[in-house]
Amino acid sequence: DAGANTDCQPKWIVQFAMMGSAYMRRVMNVEKPEVGLLNIGVEAAKGNEQAQNTYALMEKPQPFAFIGNVEARDALAGKADVIAADGFVGNVLLKNTEGVISLIFGLIKGGLMDSAKGKLAALLAKDTFRNIKRSFDSTEIGGAPLLGVEGAVIKAHGNSNARAIFCAIRQA
């Protein structure tokens, strides 16, 4: 969950994992999606009561491939196809990631523009930087699917522009 349900019971997070796994199979064509539980460590006993209880439910036979806990630093590394979390924690991860990406691109741009060599390097790598930045651009994604409801619902970011809304409609 990326923010729709901020107070969740462990069984709901398991349901989010089921829906996320089904979405990855049917929409993203991932044959056997791996599901991780977002937590503060990879060990089964890590985390708060909610995380530990959710882990206990997820390690029971489920209709998805549970790979254990996943730390926030691994969220973008592809360690899991689906990362299950309550909406509060998922939204904090999402917004922190957006902020860090924005900060890093700003630092790189500022650093490159400080010298003639940097400006030349930026010019030579312009297309590469543009492609990398585009791969992290939430505008191009449009929004996140709201699973478990009847019909196609895409939740767009609160600060979405016209392009993001267009992409959200296209995604639906």
Specify the residue positions occupied by each region the protein language model found.
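Glycine-rich phosphate/diphosphate-binding loop of Rossmann-like nucleotide-binding domains
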Residues: 7-72, 81
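Residues in well-ordered beta-strands of folded domains
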Residues: 1, 38, 155
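Short, acidic/small-residue loops that bind anionic groups at enzyme active sites
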Residues: 1-3, 60-70, 107-122
